[in-house]
C-alpha cells in the first residue's frame, strides 16, 4: 500500500515537472501567481516611505527592463530568473534593523526560491533542446551592476531601517517589471 502511494507520488512529480517544463503558458500562470504573492508579502513588511525620503536613491534599473522590447520566451524567462536570483540574494542580507516579521521575510524568500526552481527547470530543458545564445539576450551585466548598486547602498547605509524601506520599494518596482516580462512567456 505504501509503495503504491509512493509510486503514484513519484509519477505525479515526474509528470508535473515534465508538464511544467513543456509549457510556457503554465509557467506564465505560475509566475503571475507567485509574483502577486511576493508583492503581497512585500507590502506586509512595515516601513513608511515618507520617513525615509532623505535616503531615496535612483538605482538606475537597466533601460532594457524599463523599455521592454520584443522578448523571446527564453529571453524573458532568463531575465526573470536572473532578477529573482538577485532579489533572493538581497533579502538574505541582514534585515534585523527593520523590525520586520521574520516569518514574512522567510515566506518571501521561499516564494522567490520556488520561482527560481521552476524557471531553472524550464531553462535547463530549453537550453538543451534549442540553440540560442546569450548574445540574443539582454546583457546580464547591466542587471548585475544594478543589483550590485542596491547591495552597495544597503551596506553603505549599514542595513538601516530606512535603507531597507527604500530597497523594499525598489523590489516592489522590480516585480512590476517581472510581471511585464511574464507576459512574454505565453506559447
From Swiss-Prot:
Positions of modified residues (Phosphotyrosine): 24
GO cellular component: extracellular region; extracellular space
Molecular function GO terms recorded: chloramphenicol O-acetyltransferase activity; cytokine activity; cytokine receptor binding; type I interferon receptor binding
UniProt signal peptide: 1-21
Domain of life: Eukaryota
Quaternary structure annotation from Swiss-Prot or TrEMBL: Monomer.
Protein name: Interferon beta
Organism listed in the record: Homo sapiens (Human)
Higher taxonomy: Eukaryota, Metazoa, Chordata, Craniata, Vertebrata
Amino acid at each position: 500500500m505504501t509503495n503504491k502511494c509512493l509510486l503514484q507520488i513519484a509519477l505525479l512529480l515526474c509528470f508535473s515537472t515534465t508538464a511544467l517544463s513543456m509549457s510556457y503558458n503554465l509557467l506564465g500562470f505560475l509566475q503571475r501567481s507567485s509574483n502577486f504573492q511576493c508583492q503581497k508579502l512585500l507590502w506586509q513588511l512595515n516601513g513608511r516611505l515618507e520617513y525615509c525620503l532623505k535616503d531615496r536613491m535612483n538605482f538606475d534599473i537597466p533601460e532594457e527592463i524599463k523599455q521592454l522590447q520584443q522578448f523571446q520566451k527564453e529571453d524573458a524567462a532568463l531575465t526573470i530568473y536572473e532578477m529573482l536570483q538577485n532579489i533572493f540574494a538581497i533579502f538574505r542580507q541582514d534585515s534585523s534593523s527593520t523590525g520586520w516579521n521574520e516569518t514574512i521575510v522567510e515566506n518571501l524568500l521561499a516564494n522567490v526560491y520556488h520561482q527560481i526552481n521552476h524557471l531553472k527547470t524550464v531553462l535547463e530543458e530549453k537550453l538543451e533542446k534549442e540553440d540560442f545564445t546569450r548574445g540574443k539576450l539582454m546583457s546580464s551585466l547591466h542587471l548585475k551592476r544594478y543589483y550590485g548598486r542596491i547591495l552597495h547602498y544597503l551596506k553603505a547605509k549599514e542595513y538601516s531601517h530606512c535603507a531597507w524601506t527604500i530597497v523594499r520599494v525598489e523590489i516592489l518596482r522590480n516585480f512590476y517589471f517581472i510581471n511585464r516580462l511574464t507576459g512574454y512567456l505565453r506559447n
